[in-house]
C-alpha cells in the first residue's frame, strides 16, 4: 500500500505588493458564472466567502487591509491547523467579522449588510446555494464577484486567479501564477498523452465517515475533475454531477484500477476510523486508517486493492491554486 501526503503552507505573508491607486474607478469584470459585474476598484470594504489563501497569495501581504468580513467556519472549522498557523502569522485574520457559513445555514445577509461592504466575493457553490437570498445584496447596490476553484479545471483556475489579481490590484502577479498553473497542467497532460497508456478507472472518496459508511465521491468538480485532468477515467462522472454519494454496488461493478481516499485533520478525534491527512497527522496513523478501507466488503477483489493502488490524499489540497504543488 502506497501513501501520498500533500500539505503546504502558502507563503502569503511573504509576498510583496505594488502600489495601488487611492482613487476608486469603475471596472467591468466577467466572473466565473459569466456575469458582467462593475466594481469600483480598489475596493475598500470587501467580504470574502471562500478561497482566502488564494486571495492572500495573489494579493500579497496587504491583501487583507481592505477586507472587513469573511466566512470563518469554512477555514477555522474545516482546517483548524491551517487556520491556527495562518491566524498566528497574519493577525488581521482574527480581526475580521464572521458572517457565517453557507453550507450549515448560518450565513447571515444581515451581518454582511451591517459591514457596509463595497464588494462581496463568493465561491460559485456559495452563490448558487444562497440563490434569492442575495437579492438584498443586489438591491443594496453591492457588487458580487463569483470565483470557482472548486470546478478544478485549468480554465476556471486561471480565470479565478486573474479575477483576484484585478480585485487586489495585482494583475501582473496573477498572470504569472495563472501561467505557471497552466504550464504544470499542460506538462502533466503532455506526459500522459506521450505515455499512451489505457486510462485507469479511478474512484475517489472523501473518507470522513470511515470504512463502515460510504461518504461522498466527486463528479465534475474537485477530485473528480483532477482525476480526469491527469488522464484517469472517473467512475463517478456519469452518476454524480459535482459531489455526492454513489451506490457502493456501482463501485464494485466498475472495478476501479485506482482508489483515492481523501482525509483531513478534523476527523482525528471525531472518528477513530475516518481517514486523516494533513498538518500534524502522523504517517503511521494515516496508514493505519487507510488500511481499514481496503477491508470493506467486496473490495479485496477490486483491481486497485489487488495491485496495491489504494492511496490517501489531503482533502484540502483540492480547490486551491496550490493544488499543482508537490
Stretches with model-predicted labels:
Residues 215-242:
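Alpha-helical, coiled-coil/dimerization segments enriched in small aliphatic residues
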Residues 49, 54-111, 119, 124-125, ...:
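A short, structured surface patch at a secondary-structure boundary
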Residues 1-23:
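Gram-negative bacterial Sec-dependent N-terminal signal peptides
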Residues 32-34, 96-108, 239-248:
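Short helix-initiation/N-cap motifs at beta->coil->alpha
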Residues 75-81, 126-132, 147-160, 196-225:
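Extracytoplasmic ligand-binding site segments that recognize negatively charged/polar headgroups
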Residues 21-58, 172-204, 313:
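Bacterial Sec-exported substrate-binding components of ABC uptake systems
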Amino acid at each position: 500500500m502506497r501513501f501520498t501526503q500533500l500539505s503546504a503552507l502558502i507563503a502569503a505573508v511573504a509576498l510583496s505588493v505594488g502600489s495601488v491607486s487611492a482613487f476608486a474607478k469603475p471596472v467591468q469584470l466577467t466572473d466565473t458564472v459569466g456575469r458582467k459585474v462593475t466594481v469600483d476598484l480598489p475596493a475598500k470594504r470587501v467580504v470574502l466567502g471562500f478561497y482566502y489563501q488564494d486571495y492572500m497569495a495573489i494579493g500579497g501581504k496587504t491583501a487583507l487591509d481592505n477586507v472587513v468580513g469573511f466566512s470563518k467556519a469554512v477555514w477555522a472549522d474545516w482546517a483548524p491547523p491551517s487556520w491556527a498557523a495562518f491566524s498566528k502569522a497574519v493577525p488581521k485574520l482574527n480581526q475580521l467579522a464572521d458572517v457565517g457559513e453557507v453550507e450549515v445555514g448560518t450565513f447571515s445577509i444581515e451581518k454582511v449588510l451591517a459591514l457596509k461592504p463595497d464588494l462581496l466575493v463568493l465561491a460559485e457553490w456559495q452563490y448558487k446555494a444562497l440563490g434569492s437570498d442575495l437579492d438584498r445584496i443586489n438591491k443594496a447596490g453591492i457588487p458580487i464577484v463569483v470565483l470557482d476553484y472548486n470546478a478544478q479545471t485549468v480554465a476556471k483556475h486561471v480565470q479565478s486567479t486573474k479575477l483576484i489579481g484585478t480585485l487586489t490590484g495585482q494583475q501582473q502577479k496573477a498572470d504569472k501564477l495563472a501561467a505557471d498553473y497552466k504550464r504544470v497542467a499542460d506538462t502533466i497532460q503532455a506526459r500522459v498523452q506521450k505515455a499512451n497508456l489505457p486510462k485507469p478507472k479511478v474512484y475517489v472518496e472523501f473518507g470522513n465517515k470511515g470504512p463502515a459508511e460510504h461518504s461522498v465521491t466527486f463528479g465534475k468538480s474537485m477530485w473528480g475533475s483532477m482525476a480526469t485532468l491527469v488522464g484517469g477515467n472517473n467512475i463517478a462522472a456519469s452518476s454524480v454531477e459535482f459531489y455526492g454519494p454513489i451506490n457502493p454496488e456501482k463501485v464494485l461493478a466498475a472495478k476501479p484500477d485506482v482508489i483515492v481516499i481523501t482525509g483531513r485533520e478534523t476527523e482525528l478525534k471525531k472518528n477513530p476510523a475516518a481517514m486523516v491527512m494533513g498538518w500534524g497527522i502522523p504517517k503511521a496513523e494515516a496508514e493505519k486508517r487507510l488500511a481499514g478501507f481496503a477491508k470493506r466488503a467486496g473490495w479485496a477483489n477490486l483491481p486497485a486493492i489487488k495491485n496495491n493502488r489504494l492511496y490517501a490524499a489531503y482533502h484540502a489540497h483540492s480547490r486551491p491554486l496550490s493544488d499543482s504543488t508537490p
